[in-house]
Regions:
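Glycine-rich flexible loops
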Residues: 1-278
Length: 278
């Protein structure tokens, strides 16, 4: 685990916790956990066991407050989704199929998983080849037009991400890597396949300078300058949303403070840009 945003007091508190405990793991608020072992394999086994214990803890919490027999984390997602949908303010948005895309020169390649990608001219927005244009092609086009630094877009509809997208709220990070990679706060925007041009601009605006934006009832759009980084943003977004789903089971959970989240994001971008420039 790499912790990018640290302070001397934070480091000393972790060292102190390690010294005071005979445990092989120390949980750090907003920073995951440090897992130790006599070898890489031993430390990895500790990390796996800790993940299992934490997931079981959340599942048991869901059983207690729902009165239902929940056996897997997917049951927690189902319960949280039902609670969100039953709220007075919930208004369902039109759901649509996710697409991934890539910018290659002056062209946009966009398509659903397993289908032949459509090829679109980035300047005009007109199709110049490839397969059928998907419903969300204008959404991808709008982001590329607004963000010169973006070359890859991934649309995840992983169950935890979809659950959090149904809230329709701005999501504040509970984990440091979400603040670092995705943004200090993740907004939600509505995309309507029947009003693509207007709603695509709203999504691009909500994304801003971040690397992720929630799409109401449709998961999240994750962006980056290359394919590897886009996949990393997607993975962190999915993990961050899983954490947020678990947090829905508790009355009071405190996200990372606004100033700290912006600082984490800024330091990550500065360090990453220096690394990329080498």
């Amino acid at each position: 685990m790499v912790i990018i945003c640290t302070t001397p007091s934070f480091v000393f508190s972790v060292i102190g916790a390690v010294k005071r405990s005979e445990s092989k793991a120390v949980i750090m608020k907003h920073h995951g956990a440090v897992c130790m072992g006599t070898s890489y394999e031993d430390a990895f086994a500790v990390a796996t066991a800790l993940e299992d214990v934490c997931e079981k803890f959340i599942i048991e919490r869901c059983c207690d407050i729902s009165g239902k027999a929940v056996e897997a984390f997917s049951g927690v997602v189902d319960y949280v989704t039902d609670v969100i949908k039953s709220g007075d303010k919930y208004r369902a948005a039109t759901e649509f199929a996710p697409c991934n895309s890539a910018r290659k020169g002056n062209f946009l390649f966009v398509g659903e998983e397993g289908k032949h990608a459509a090829i679109i001219d980035l300047k005009s927005g007109a199709q110049v080849g490839g397969g059928e244009i998907p419903d969300s092609a204008d959404l991808h086009w709008a982001i590329y037009k607004k963000r010169d630094d973006v070359n890859y877009i991934r649309h995840t509809k992983e169950e935890n991400v979809v659950a959090m997208s149904r809230k329709g709220n701005t999501m504040k990070p509970l984990l440091d890597d979400l603040a670092q990679l995705c943004g200090p706060k993740i907004k939600t925007a509505i995309f309507n396949p029947n009003e693509t041009l207007k709603t695509s601009k709203r999504v691009a605006k909500a994304l801003g300078k971040n690397n992720a934006v929630l799409i109401k009832d449709n998961g999240a759009i994750c962006v980056a300058g290359n394919e590897y980084d886009a996949e990393a943003v997607e993975l962190v977004m999915e993990k961050g949303c899983k954490t947020a789903v678990g947090a829905e089971l508790y009355a009071e959970t405190k996200p990372i403070g606004t100033l700290d989240a912006h600082l984490m994001n800024f330091i990550y971008k500065v360090k990453y840009s220096k690394k990329a420039g080498k």
